């Protein structure tokens, strides 16, 4: 949970208490608890009424920072820090940190990292993918905060399959302090989502211009245009050229082979009117695996064309993932964090995805 993982099969909590037996006994009174699966001296496993099981580890108050750090993981991060500390003559094990045979109890996670000569490493990047080396070189990346987000470039309205009016989307974006928001409804081939024809798109554009002037807000006229089976786009270039923002996405033909799918996306990026590739791997968490696509090839081309790849903040997608985002960063590819919101509540999904950046 602290590492903001995409999927979890259990909830692990660390509790500080000088009376572990009493703390564990009180867990049975939690409102979502339907039964105690197992209980030991300092650990309890509970079944919840819905969702994954709950595992609770009780630590003494003094040992809480250490227990929290180990519980947060990842195991690769723990292993790498143990190896790093060993080179300094320190020992890290399940009980704590040892200096010359004497246990040292850190007062916080920050103090723990300080003992091994490192700055605090945020939980979101404790994945064992170079963060310890980066910390040792004072090169940890900046994690994006909500205050860093300036706008949302992929929102839907009632004109296609959203539930908000264009004005409601704009007002919600204003309330969040955004500088801009883009209306990117679906294009005509996605009939199930009430996709827009060129004529409807021009009508919508006029409404956007009116609301933009009325609110004095940078409301952008966009489109989420379908990438068709051969890599061509669902709308003519002359129509796309009239848009402020063009998001190109695949919504069909997922079973093509890897090179076909890769070529489709690359061909779309080579269109000068395409700004962003939406949800680039097409996954739906728990329902549909990512389609076969060579993201390294895609990013190599994106770095040349200047195309932006989306981090789609929909909880069903979270696409790009953290691995691909790190790859994009290393290759100089631009990223846009968008909500793909179809409703008021979905505009808040920005909170879930900003952490991956």
Locate each region found by the language model.
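Short loop/edge segments at beta-strand edges and connector loops
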Residues: 221-223
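Charged catalytic cores and adjacent phosphate/nucleic-acid-binding surfaces used
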Residues: 2-157, 163-177, 181-183, 188-218, ...
């Amino acid at each position: 949970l602290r590492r903001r993982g995409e999927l979890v099969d259990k909830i692990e909590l660390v509790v500080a208490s000088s009376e572990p037996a009493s703390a564990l006994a009180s867990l049975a009174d939690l409102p979502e608890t339907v039964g105690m699966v197992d209980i030991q001296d300092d650990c309890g496993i509970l079944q919840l009424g819905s969702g994954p099981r709950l595992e609770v580890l009780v630590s003494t108050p003094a040992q809480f920072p250490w227990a929290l750090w180990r519980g947060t993981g990842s195991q690769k991060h723990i292993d790498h820090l143990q190896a790093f500390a060993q080179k300094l003559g320190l020992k890290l094990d399940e009980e704590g940190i040892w200096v010359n045979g004497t246990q040292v109890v850190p007062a916080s996670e920050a103090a723990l990292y300080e003992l091994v000569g490192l700055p605090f490493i945020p939980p979101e990047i404790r994945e064992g993918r170079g963060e310890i080396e980066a910390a040792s070189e004072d090169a940890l990346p900046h994690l994006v905060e909500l205050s860093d987000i300036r706008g949302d470039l992929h929102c839907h309205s009632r004109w296609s399959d959203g539930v908000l009016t264009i004005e409601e989307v704009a007002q919600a974006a204003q309330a969040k302090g955004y500088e801009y928001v883009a209306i990117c409804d679906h294009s005509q081939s996605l009939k199930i989502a009430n996709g827009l024809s060129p004529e409807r798109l021009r009508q919508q554009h006029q409404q956007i211009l009116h609301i933009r002037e009325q609110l004095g807000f940078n409301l952008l006229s966009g489109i989420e245009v379908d990438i068709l089976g051969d890599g061509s786009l669902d709308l003519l270039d002359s129509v796309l050229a009239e848009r402020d923002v063009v998001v190109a996405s695949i919504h069909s033909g997922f079973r093509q082979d890897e090179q076909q799918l890769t070529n489709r996306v690359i061909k779309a990026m080579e269109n000068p009117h395409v700004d962003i590739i939406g949800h680039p791997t097409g996954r739906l968490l728990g329902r549909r695996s990512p389609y076969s696509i060579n993201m390294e090839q895609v990013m190599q081309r994106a770095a040349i064309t200047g195309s932006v790849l989306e981090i789609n903040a929909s909880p069903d997608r979270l696409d790009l993932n953290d691995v691909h985002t790190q790859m994009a960063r290393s290759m100089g590819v631009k990223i846009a964090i968008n909500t793909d919101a179809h409703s008021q509540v979905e505009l808040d999904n920005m909170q879930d995805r900003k952490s991956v950046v």
